[in-house]
């Protein structure tokens, strides 16, 4: 195992436009970190810099407390798993897994021992003589992981390894990756655009946006206390409801853009002169009686089996509430909703940052 450290790392291809703005990250021995964000946010570029496939514009990278910023990929003690498997079609599973060791001059017996052990861990033993074309997508991805495992790297790097698999197989492979990490305990940096992968695999999540690490924290921290409007809107399915507005002069109510007032449990007069955004997750909205709740005109109801999603309008803006599977109001009806004060989030609309009490 090894630690991984990124110190003030930046990347720009033209010397003017930053692709990666200053990133600082400390990954502990054996930690599993997931970088998540939309396409083009810089997560794969950052991973490639750790691998040595891209040069940093500034800053340094350390693996096991050794500066590797200028080292070639082969000298960094890393192994990378790609989304397209990158298997040699004319080679057997055994030879694909062994190839990297052969070109590094390992002996036949050492190669056999390492490949056999990786095949046992990944349940590939019956497939070692097959060619990649004879394997399923999930089996090919396990071979790609096996090729990384036999190198016994200090750090595993994963670049969207499950993106080419169908939904059912992605679930299976997520479980296998969790089990693999528990067994090997190798420091891992994983890139995905899929927030479900991020939340289920990570010990800590890095939410990337336009080359910036918007938030670094545990899955629970990122979900329960998003640091910015971007994190609030990106993490969660469906996303957090967000309502533009402002706080009244006395600080006792949040006023939506169309004048609807929502009483605040704790007065916040210090926020009265700011443009704010209120957020609440769909599962935290509760149905209540008309005397206590705010009315929502129901537009559509999504039946998901375990629960239902009610889509409507409130305060002139769209809102989604997660209801139990037993609650099935008709489209066009009016629901009365309660927004518990403890479940409310507030953000500065101009900076996008979370407001702290």
Protein language model annotation of sequence segments:
Residues 238-241, 249-357:
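Non-catalytic connector elements of ABC transporters
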Residues 36-38:
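The feature captures the beta-strand-to-loop junction immediately N-terminal to the Walker
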Residues 59-67:
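Conserved ABC transporter NBD signature motif
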């Amino acid at each position: 195992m090894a630690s991984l450290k990124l110190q003030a790392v930046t990347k720009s291809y033209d010397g003017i436009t930053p692709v990666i703005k200053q990133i600082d990250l400390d990954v502990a021995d054996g930690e599993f970190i997931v970088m998540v964000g939309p396409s083009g946010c810089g997560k794969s570029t950052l991973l490639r810099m750790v691998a040595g496939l891209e040069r940093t514009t500034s800053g340094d990278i350390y693996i096991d407390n050794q500066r590797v910023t200028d080292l070639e990929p082969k000298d960094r003690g890393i192994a990378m798993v790609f989304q397209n498997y990158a298997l040699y079609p004319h080679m057997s599973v055994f030879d694909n897994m062994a190839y990297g060791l052969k070109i590094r001059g390992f002996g036949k017996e050492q190669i056999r021992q390492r490949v056999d052990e990786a095949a046992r861990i990944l349940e590939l033993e019956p497939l070692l003589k097959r060619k990649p074309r004879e394997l399923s997508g999930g089996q090919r991805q396990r071979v790609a992981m096996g090729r990384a495992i036999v190198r016994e790297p200090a750090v595993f790097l994963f670049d969207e390894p499950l993106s080419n698999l169908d939904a059912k197989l992605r679930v299976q492979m997520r479980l296998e990756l969790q089990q693999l990490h528990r067994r090997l305990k190798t420091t891992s940096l994983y890139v995905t655009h899929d927030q479900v992968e991020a939340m289920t695999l990570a010990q800590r999540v890095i939410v990337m946006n336009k080359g910036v690490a918007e938030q670094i924290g545990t899955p629970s921290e990122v979900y329960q206390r998003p640091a910015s409007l971007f994190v609030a809107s990106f993490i969660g399915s469906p996303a957090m409801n967000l309502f533009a507005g402002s706080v009244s002069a006395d600080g006792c109510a949040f006023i939506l853009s169309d004048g609807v007032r929502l009483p605040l449990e704790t007065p916040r007069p210090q926020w009265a002169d700011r443009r704010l955004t209120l957020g609440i997750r769909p599962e935290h909205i509760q149905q209540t009686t008309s005397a206590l709740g705010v009315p929502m005109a129901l537009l559509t109801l999504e039946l998901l089996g375990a629960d239902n999603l009610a889509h409507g309008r409130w305060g002139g803006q769209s809102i989604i509430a997660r209801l139990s599977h037993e609650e099935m109001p008709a489209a066009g009806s009016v629901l009365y909703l309660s927004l518990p004060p403890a479940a409310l989030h507030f953000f500065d609309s101009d900076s996008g940052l979370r407001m702290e009490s």
